[in-house]
């Protein structure tokens, strides 16, 4: 592909300073960002006669022009390169998509503090413990905390509305401070111990509880001593189960495995010598990218992502050494204004943690490769069955979900040659049709999906319709209209269930000819079709249930005179849900902010009929 770029003329204008370069294609999109200690030397390497790397050949063939920015040092170049990669997301760079904030356990500064899951800006006053690698780790920790420390986990509105202990008190998971079942001093003591435990100071917590147990026994408060004994035993069991090192402090341990174009960075989050949790990251890696670039790009993007609230330790242990390690250390230290070290040659506990991280990374890549090969095999077989001239790169599937015509939702799921591509999934809330009219729902969904499609848009090679011939005809009609002026259009295939509706008995129908065929129930190609069909159904029904619940909550309360969105929200938040509102007495309803005794009576009468 010729882009008209004159490399010799350009290189004559480039200096030998440190800096960053941005490569653009003919459309003006940034396709690659790089940095160099010597820009002239680095950029000249792209235009040698013999380029051995296929990735570099493809990149150079698309260059239309190059912008260069000089920097004072290589450290500055590293930081600017990272900023540009985050800004432009170039297709030939290694990209880490880590846009979710990290979850924490939150301990509030209330008179009776609560423990809660928290993700996002830390605006509320209190203490934040973490970050945890994922939401599951936080929920697991909160569940454990309930068993160890009887501290409330309910929100403040629910706490204020209690007139008697809730189920958590009966299960010995909360001491019910809301109704005075525990003194402030006793509750504060449990909060203090929970805080120490979350900081990793298990031994100190156990020591304090042992002292309290002995003191209670001396005072012949045997019931209280028994509670402390049970708490100590539970804590010791937990401590035995957790892998702890006494001298490692806070650090991230990263095992890296890179094979067949798949890179996995498995992180162990070590805090106070304890594994807080782990998480695998899979950056997008262009073909034939060398390991040095993968390592450098990941570490920069991971530790310099200001959009993510992440506590960064002073020490990182990683399984691979690379040439620019010390420059990267300096760049991160400068950007964060704190000491930051990366180690690769470690012993004792650090070596043990590193082996664990590396094993997990290796296993993760092997699993992904196995899955990738399985999916690839299914794609190839489907291409053979459909007698296609070109490989399938993108498939989509539509499904409709509703309950007796209520809250209709259409789903569109996307598969590429690696399987589900969830970032491309879409839902469509269907409006303005006769309830239960699946044909009209399908027509609206397909129309909205391809409303402004053009040749440069994301056109599926195969478009599956989960339904019979009627829905398929509607979809084919819309596709014919939308693609009339384009050279390419998707092949439509209907997936109709058999009379018994059992998996393996599906009939497949071509949209253009309406001819039908079936596949053997053990066919890998059929398994691929079933996978995308089932995923479309799951995504549609989840969206429908969420919409239906929201609609029912809204319509039930807002049909009552005087109840608008604000009062509805206050009622649901204060009492905990629609069923709790329906079961509340007039007095309980009147405790909700903004609800008078007269309004409470009106709500009570309306909901009780």
Swiss-Prot record:
Domain UVR: 203-238
Principal location: cytoplasm
InterPro entries: GIY-YIG_endonuc, GIY-YIG_endonuc_sf, GIY-YIG_UvrC_Cho, Hlx-hairpin-Hlx_DNA-bd_motif, RuvA_2-like, UVR_dom, UVR_dom_sf, UvrABC_protein_C
Subcellular location: Cytoplasm
Entry annotated with the keyword Flavoprotein: no
Alphabetically ordered keywords of this record: Cytoplasm, DNA damage, DNA excision, DNA repair, Excision nuclease, SOS response
Pfam families: GIY-YIG, HHH_5, UVR, UvrC_RNaseH, UvrC_RNaseH_dom
Domain (GIY-YIG): residue spans on this chain: 16-94
A single GO BP: SOS response
A GO molecular-function annotation: DNA binding
Domain of life of the organism encoding this protein: Bacteria
Cellular component GO terms held in the UniProt record: cytoplasm; excinuclease repair complex
The family this protein is said to belong to: Belongs to the UvrC family.
Chain's role: The UvrABC repair system catalyzes the recognition and processing of DNA lesions. UvrC both incises the 5' and 3' sides of the lesion. The N-terminal half is responsible for the 3' incision and the C-terminal half is responsible for the 5' incision.
Quaternary state and interactors: Interacts with UvrB in an incision complex.
NCBIfam families, sorted: PRK00558.1-5 (NF001824), uvrC (TIGR00194)
Protein name: UvrABC system protein C
Organism field: Shewanella sp. (strain MR-4)
Lineage, uppermost ranks: Bacteria, Pseudomonadati, Pseudomonadota, Gammaproteobacteria, Alteromonadales
